[in-house]
């Protein structure tokens, strides 16, 4: 009888304790949500997110992708000229002409470059930087620069000469270096995994260069010969080119020497899983399964180009199965971030209309699906607008380091503001 009474008292005490603890957790979360609402209740941020009632912790990412580029302080004509020479070298490595304009001032689809056969653009440095495809001539008047099939090439710039800056002052933006990146990831992340196509692979590549502090050779495999390393050094790491540099990059930080990573003190894992079409989906599923339940695991996912920009198929074959795995695991981790397909348009308007209108539609459909399920959406198109692409698809170090800085700032803010409300 005595044992029964003691058991009853103990059980009653546990019930009371659970009620108190749950009450404290509810109050903490309610108070934290109030703080979040207060943090975002401002003239600027309210206007930016008007009409969307999504979770604040997920829309934090939008706070960093809404912004603009500012040229770096102290930028000189010499630096601009040197950058243009670098770009010409990249074009040459891609088997493109070093100059994409003709000397006779003609441009457009009907005026091709010899011997490459590429359509001619206009010289951005000349007095006539605009191509009017209707006339096939370069010019500088409104009729040449502002018509529906005109393109002003003087407005495009190399991202390496500029810094990305969020529009809202409510988005504190830190420029991460190797040490601060390591500190952030060591404290808050167990696995940072990138799944998708070459656009997503470039995020992993850039993160690797940032962590190693070596933008020249930081992502090249150690087994390469000295000649191969030289052929693919620097920004050539971002382009396949004549030396197939994309095949000479690491896919996992574990491929590097330990001392290259956070002074030998990296406690997190990061790797790229190249799974960009339906046939490679099983590899992506295996990756997600290995991360189920890991509270500090994060996946950045981006596919579409190699699935014919079919949003219905991507949702059915990638996102829904991923979400089902995560939900059925009884946990809400790993954290899934969807990255849209970036867009570049420093080419003829006719090419841009043909190639990028379908991308914009795909991005819109995917973003709508993700936002309805509180999946953070990394809107990369806002970041790549008006920056140069040398191959018409990819951006180099400048565009990708901006993306990685945005991602790190988002994660930092999410960890600081939202972490206790998510546990």
Where are these regions (language model features)?
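A compositional signature for long Ser/Thr(±Pro)-rich, low-complexity
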Residues: 2-423
């Amino acid at each position: 009888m005595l044992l029964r009474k003691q058991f009853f008292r103990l059980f009653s005490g546990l019930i009371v304790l659970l009620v108190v603890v749950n009450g404290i957790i509810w109050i903490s979360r309610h108070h934290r949500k109030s703080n979040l609402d207060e943090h975002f209740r401002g003239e600027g941020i309210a206007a930016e997110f008007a009409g969307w009632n999504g979770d604040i912790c997920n829309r934090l990412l939008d706070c960093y992708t809404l912004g603009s580029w500012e040229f770096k302080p102290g930028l000189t004509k010499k630096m601009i000229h040197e950058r243009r020479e670098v770009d010409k070298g990249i074009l040459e490595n891609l088997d493109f002409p070093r100059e994409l304009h003709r000397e006779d001032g003609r441009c457009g689809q009907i005026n091709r470059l010899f011997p490459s056969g590429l359509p001619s653009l206009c010289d951005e440095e000349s007095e006539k930087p605009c191509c009017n495809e209707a006339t096939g001539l370069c010019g500088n008047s409104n009729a040449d620069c502002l018509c529906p099939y005109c393109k002003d090439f003087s407005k495009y710039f190399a991202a390496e000469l500029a810094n990305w800056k969020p529009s809202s002052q409510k988005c504190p933006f830190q420029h991460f270096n190797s040490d601060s990146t390591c500190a952030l990831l060591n404290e808050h992340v167990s696995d940072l995994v990138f799944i998708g196509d070459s656009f997503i692979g470039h995020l992993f590549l850039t993160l690797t260069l940032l962590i190693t502090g070596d933008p020249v050779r930081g992502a090249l495999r150690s087994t390469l010969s000295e000649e191969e390393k030289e052929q693919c050094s620097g920004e050539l790491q971002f382009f396949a080119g004549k030396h197939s540099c994309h095949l000479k990059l690491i896919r996992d930080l574990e491929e590097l020497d330990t001392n290259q990573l956070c002074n030998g003190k990296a406690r997190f894992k990061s790797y790229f899983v190249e799974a960009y079409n339906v046939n490679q989906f099983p590899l992506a599923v295996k990756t997600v399964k290995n991360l189920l339940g890991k509270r500090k695991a994060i996946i950045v996912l981006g596919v579409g180009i190699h699935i014919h920009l079919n949003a219905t198929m991507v949702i059915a074959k990638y996102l829904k199965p991923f979400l089902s795995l995560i939900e059925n695991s009884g946990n809400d981790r790993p954290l899934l971030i969807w990255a849209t397909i970036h867009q570049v348009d420093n080419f003829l308007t006719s090419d841009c209309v043909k190639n990028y209108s379908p991308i914009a539609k795909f991005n819109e459909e995917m973003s709508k699906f993700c936002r309805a399920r509180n999946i953070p959406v990394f809107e990369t198109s806002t970041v790549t607008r008006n920056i140069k692409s040398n191959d018409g698809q990819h951006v180099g170090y400048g565009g990708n380091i901006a993306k990685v800085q945005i991602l790190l700032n988002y994660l930092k803010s999410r960890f600081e503001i939202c972490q206790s409300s998510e546990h």
